[in-house]
Amino acid sequence: MIIITATFVLADSSMRPDAVQKATPLQQATRDTELGCEAYVFSPDPAEESKVAVYELWKDRDSLHAHFDHENYFNMGSMFGEIGLAGAESKKWRVTAFEPVYDETPRARAEFFSQDEQSPEDPIIVAGYIDLHDPSERSDLLAESAPLQLATRNDEPGCQMYVFSADPCKEERIAVVEIWDNYDSLHQHFDHENYFNMGNLIRSTSGRDSNHRKFRCDLSEPVYDQNRRARADFFTLE
């Protein structure tokens, strides 16, 4: 498995609604038609109005390589080029293990409890979604979550990314992506008031279904090489 994470910073934040609207059919097409695509979300960051958060999950290198040659990829890139970016940071991550965040109790676990071996210094990505039973609750929930998201990003050591955002393709869905430096930073987050406050906010809704997984990654590198070509292989190993 390969994960791509990115943050796009728009040159003009007022253009974000237009960008998200134009990206929606391209996201749906990628999810529906490209083999090996397990997640593909470009969503508005509720805590920073100029940013779009990106999370992709691909089955293997072949499926990601095929995506980089697909019209969906080129159309998405052209659209954001027309909208205008002030900056973009994108990484791909090689996944070595994955499992649910919660054990059977259910309790959030930072260690990989289903694995015999632990790699406590490897980065961990937490990703998934929350489907609200009442989609009309999503907008207010995300607005209320913005200060909690910023507090987690700014105050918790080892937090590289922490975004709960509106999936443009599903009106009931909140997309989740977090990046933590290692086991210790994620473990501390699960004992932090930010984690409990976010959980209480989500549980204040009338009902929800969720799916959260954590992914252990042993390698990350830029998506683009020095020639600005998107690479599905891990070229820094060459």
Give the ranges of each region predicted by the language model.
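Glycine-rich beta-strand-turn "strand-cap" elements at beta-sheet edges
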Residues: V41-A47, M76-D122, V163-E172, N197-E238
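Short, low-complexity N-terminal intrinsically disordered segments enriched in polar/charged residues
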Residues: P17, Q21, E117-P120
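Ser/Thr/Pro-rich low-complexity tandem-repeat tracts
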Residues: S14-P17, A23, S43, S63, ...
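An amphipathic, aromatic/His-enriched active-site/gating alpha helix that lines ligand/cofactor pockets
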Residues: T24-C37, L57-R94, A151-Q160, I179-R216
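Short, well-ordered beta-strand segments in beta-rich or mixed alpha/beta enzyme
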Residues: I2-V9, V41-F68, I124-D131, V163-H192
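Hydrophobic, helix-prone linear segments
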Residues: M1-A11, M15, E99, E221, ...
